[in-house]
Amino acid sequence: MDLTTDQVTRGMAGMMYVQDPNNDPLYSQLPNEYGVNDIPLNIQAKNFNFDDNNNVTSIKAGEKPGPGSWGMVNGVVGGVMHVPHSMVRLRMLNGSTIKVFNIGLTKELLYDYTTANDSIRFERMWMVATGGGYLDYPRPARNNLFSPGDRREFIADFGQYNPGDTIYLTHFDNKLPADAKYSKHWYSSAMMAFVVDETIRPTRPVTSIPATLKP
C-alpha cells in the first residue's frame, strides 16, 4: 500500500496492450504492427547515482523523489529507433511520478529555453486516442501537454520525410505554464530520435487516416 511512487521511481511504469481486432472496426485502418509501425513510448524523468568514473550505478530514489534530471523513453536515455517510410502509431504514456511534459516532434536537435521563442516548429501529428479511448475524429496536434499518468495516441506520417532523415521526440519546457515547471534542470531537448528507414516495410502499411474514429 502507498508504495506506487517509490516503485515507479525505482523501476519502470509500463503499459499493456488490450486489443480485440475482431470487434474493433478501426483495427485495420490504423497502424497495428507492434514494434514496426505501432510503437509504445513510456516517457519518464529519472535521477541516477554515479560512481567515480561517471558510470551509472543505480536509480536515485527517496521518500519524496523529485522529477529527475534525465529524460528516458522506454528505459533508454537518448535512444534511436528506425521507423518505416510511412505512417506510424505512437502510443505515449507519461510514466513519471511528478514531471509534466510538453511533447512534440521536431527536426531540430536542441533548444535552449532561455533564448528560444515561439518560432519553434513542431511537426504535425494526428491525435487519435487518449486514456478514455478513441476520439470522435483525428485531431491535428503539434505539441501536447502530458501530466503524470496521461496516455495519448498519435499518428505520425514519416512518409513525408526523406529516407535517412532524423526526427526528434522533443520536450519543450518553455511552452509549459510557469506552475508546471518543477525542475530548473529541464529545458527543451530531444528525448529520442526516429530515423526514417525505407528498408523497414510493414506487412500492411497505412497511407491515410480515417476521417472519423467513432460511428
Regions found by a protein language model. Name each.
Residues P25-Y27, E33, F48-V56:
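Surface-exposed, gly/pro-biased binding rims or lids
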Residues M1-Y27:
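Hydrophobic or amphipathic alpha-helical targeting/insertion segments
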Residues I43, N49-K214:
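Histidine- and aromatic-rich segments of cupredoxin/plastocyanin-like copper-binding domains
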Residues P21-I39, T199-P215:
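Low-complexity, Pro/Ser/Thr- and charge-rich linker/hinge segments at domain boundaries
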Residues G11, V36-D38, M87, I98:
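Extracytoplasmic
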